[in-house]
């Protein structure tokens, strides 16, 4: 019989969380630890405990949050015997209690600790900064919307509401926006009547989106939360919970969000980053429908993610419908856009500035050979950081007017892609957009060993890439020089690969997406 340990009681007094763990099996644990599995800064804190045996094993233990570091972390409990290690799961009563009542510790410094259920209802202790959505006002809106949705659902079901959004609901410039714009501008009024876009009022695109005013839902407003509960379908470039406050405490709304169907527009094309553990059918954020851009990508999703082929339509990315080459031969631009690193996300500035990622790009921006090459050929380098690392953009700087640093949201990414003459990236799926436009791509993969170890890919980085691969800075400078001298012409061997990597290049992707949804709803 499988041994399962349940968390059956949680009580909080000041900075200490007191817990009862129980199992139907007899256990004699040697140790209990609170473990953080952060890949770059793992940690383990011993927990004191007492144990009793009757007809079951009962363990009393506690967590002193005063001993834990104040940074974005998820901690789990590991109960170890001589031969096995177990992670306790929350029983149904505790899961309900965490949703209905407030279990949290505010240790100061604008941070928050709270217990929650992870994958498979595993106990997690989350630490994160306080946000403006942690107050009583948000909880009242959530509860009111939840109760009203229960009353309205039978009447509103026939409306077939679609909610469209992007990462963190903070922007309108990716596949979500372009599909929404298609719906607003190409569909007849009756067909677009119940299609809405979720957007934070602090978004740089908020003002521009007001022309669609009645179809815009202000993020975390009462109307937004109500429509989240009543929607028939989410259509998004990221997971379901990007439509709600990020990393919330246990609540009624998140559970309902996770029960909704979603058409996944994707943020980019799969290949350079393994994400099946996240977006797979049995992953942390499974999808209902999964848009892809080629038969090759469809094979990845059916083979590695576990989806049926009829749920993986080959339709193309919505934003490609507006892509066109706008590069200027008089002022050439090298777009530099590296992807994020899981080990750097939500870390502090000091940690980030000590990373190879930061130091590599800062060293590149100061490379005299590169700066001379740019100056001599009237070329500018444009650096655009990934949205998950946007808070670190202020740490980058360059004294050269030839290096332009653009904060996330200041300029639509599509515009940067269309205006560039060439892309320098590492593992970012933005490479597919540039390749779609028949522009050269250089893959600067200075930390490939660590990346393969922590992320992995579906493509063979040494043989399958559709652009030059560089590991060292001198290789990168040489590759840049070669492309400048060839007037940024794509190499023939990379041109030949395109027909197998794109099923369509006809600017009808949004139409295919819409037709598929209508046919399958």
Which stretches of residues belong to each language-model region?
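Basic, ligand-binding patches in group-transfer machinery
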Residues: 1-161
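A nucleotide-sugar donor-handling region in carbohydrate enzymes
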Residues: 132-150, 266, 272-361, 387, ...
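Conserved catalytic-core segment of nucleotide-activated headgroup transferases in glycan assembly
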Residues: 172-180, 184, 188, 318-395, ...
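Catalytic binding pocket for nucleotide-activated donors in carbohydrate/polymer assembly enzymes
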Residues: 395-400, 429-504
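C-terminal alpha-helical cap of glycosyltransferases
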Residues: 506-521
